[in-house]
Amino acid sequence: MSAPTFRLCPADIGLEVAFAGRSNAGKSSAINALTNQRQLARSSKTPGRTQMINFFNVGDADRRLVDLPGYGYAAVPLEMKKEWQVELEEYLVSRSSLAGLVLMTDIRHPLKFFDEQMLRWAKDGELPVHILLTKADKLKYGASKNALLNTRKRLKQLGLNCSIQLFSALRKEGLDELAGVMGNWYEYQLEANKIIESSFALLEGSELEDAIEKDAVQKDKNLKDSAQKESK
């Protein structure tokens, strides 16, 4: 692992809304547009390499926005991809404070394979999902509407009941609709541009390295214990 596991997340209390998407889907831009802050969610210079989970308070400490690591970037080593697929599934299915998932997908290439896998995991966890067709400014109005219609048809084929909207971080289009959906999940009136950055963050620097090392040691111990039990 090159990053902490979800076991290092804050206590599983309150309400969380997670943002997920492929490494080039515009996730950081969407979060920054929603919060009206340019660098609240930072984009890595190497897409897919940033494997930090970032938490931000939304109004109070019991309501959080969770910025999940981007997925699907080809240059990421296969072993790292497998590790994070396991972690993402565990988080989506078992995190009791998770109230909803905002899934971002590029309107020009919507619902790639791993996007659909994320939706299946969310369904397994009975988690509501709101889909953003990002970068809507890249298409003309008619093409955007067709993409929206076709994505709805695909969701129906998959047997998934998700809300969906057009979104443009560049033009700040769709912010109020997104804030309304999140507000319902938070059970809290939420306004775009008024999300407050959390005073806490996950570990960084040497503390992060220590946490990663401890987690790796614990995983090895668990595997050895399991192997010993099976051999008896």
Curated annotation (Swiss-Prot):
It holds the Pfam family MMR_HSR1. GO terms for molecular function: GTP binding; metal ion binding. InterPro entries: G_ENGB_dom, GTP-bd, GTP-bd_ribosome_bio_YsxC, P-loop_NTPase. Gene3D superfamilies: P-loop containing nucleotide triphosphate hydrolases. The keyword Magnesium applies. Residues 13-188 form the EngB-type G domain. Its cofactor is Mg(2+). GTP binds at residues 21-28, 48-52, 67-70, 134-137, 167-169. PROSITE patterns: G_ENGB. GO terms for biological process: division septum assembly. Necessary for normal cell division and for the maintenance of normal septation. HAMAP family: GTPase_EngB (MF_00321). Belongs to the TRAFAC class TrmE-Era-EngA-EngB-Septin-like GTPase superfamily. EngB GTPase family. This is Probable GTP-binding protein EngB. The lineage of its organism: Bacteria, Pseudomonadati, Pseudomonadota, Gammaproteobacteria, Moraxellales.
